[in-house]
Amino acid sequence: MKKAVILFNLGGPDKLENVEPFLFNLFNDPAILNLPGLLRYPLAKLIANRRAPTAKKIYKELGGGSPILKLTKEQATALELKLNSDDNLSDYKCFIVMRCWHPRAENVVKEVINYNPDELILMPLYPQYSAATSGSSIKEWNDICIKNNFKVKTSTICCYPTD
């Protein structure tokens, strides 16, 4: 049985010139700014433009970009190895989706369709549930799956344990 594990994270700009587009994606999310698109889009542009200079300074201190994709790839590799070594009946493959930067759900859904799994396991890497993080990521994923007529048994691992 083939199982696809979809790891969700926020994402982050990979280089300084991508800080403003990343911020725009963040603030253009209806779960962040709950406004009609005609208002949300220009407001997201304005906020991203105003916050970009300060955010660029912070990302510059981090080496010029966010480490989140690299770290999430390391987590995905370790999880895939562990799952495949513990379960001889299933073949697991981990995929990464970033909500506000690359790789985006739109592209990853196509990769998952090509993998042709029997089951999907959605696993947000946010430490707790929030409509603006886990909720938004899962909604975007489900919307894109519907758009691509991709239907497969799906389960969701929501949040980290509290104890």
Where do the PLM segments sit?
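Active-site-proximal alpha-helix that buttresses catalytic centers in soluble enzyme cores
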Residues: 1-163
